[in-house]
Regions:
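N-terminal hydrophobic targeting/anchoring segments and the immediately downstream early-domain regions
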Residues: 1-156, 160
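Substrate-binding cleft of carbohydrate-active enzyme catalytic domains
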Residues: 161-167
Length: 167
């Protein structure tokens, strides 16, 4: 069994669902995952509106709206994909694997949508996210990523976010 710890499938799912397609994982990705013997995924919630991303077409949406949309698309895909099971722990992943299904951890890649509303971290947790990166490549209210000023690092708000995420 192979675990793909950083999968951008949710990005593709969301892009296609917003264009009117459904059953994206089943129709476009399941056979590739089987062929590659992928038994587990780390699905990234990435909603940064880069100019070359499909999110640029939704420039009127803030980061949290994009996050909610991606989660709605993910939930719809789960309903269409009984072979894919979201998990929160390694024990759950082993159970799903033993049942012959594919497990998926949810990860947040860049927390720009949190802004200064740290209660949104709890919403990520309710959705099942157990992995969170404060930045993608950008600089946001929590921290400076690879594309930000290296002198800025983790902000005070970012420190509080880390404390909350460790609970």
């Amino acid at each position: 069994m192979i675990f793909d710890g950083h999968s951008d499938l949710l990005y593709d799912v969301t892009r296609r669902r917003l264009a009117g397609e459904n059953c994206v994982l089943e129709r476009r990705h399941r056979q590739k995952l089987r062929k590659g013997r992928i038994g587990g995924l780390g699905l990234s919630l990435w909603v940064t509106a880069e100019p070359d991303s499909f999110w640029a077409a939704y420039s009127g949406w803030d980061g949290w709206r994009r996050t909610e949309e991606m989660m709605a698309c993910f939930q719809a895909e789960l309903a269409d994909s009984p072979w894919l099971v979201p998990v929160r722990t390694a024990a759950e992943a082993r159970e799903v694997q033993a049942a012959g299904k594919t497990f998926a951890f949810l990860a947040v890649e860049g927390m720009e949508p949190v802004g200064n509303r740290l209660e949104r971290l709890e919403q990520y947790a309710r959705w099942g996210a157990r992995i969170g990166m404060l930045t993608w490549n950008e600089e946001n209210r929590l921290a400076a990523g690879a594309g930000g000023d290296p002198e800025n690092g983790l902000t005070e708000l970012g420190r509080e976010a880390v404390r909350r995420m460790q609970r």
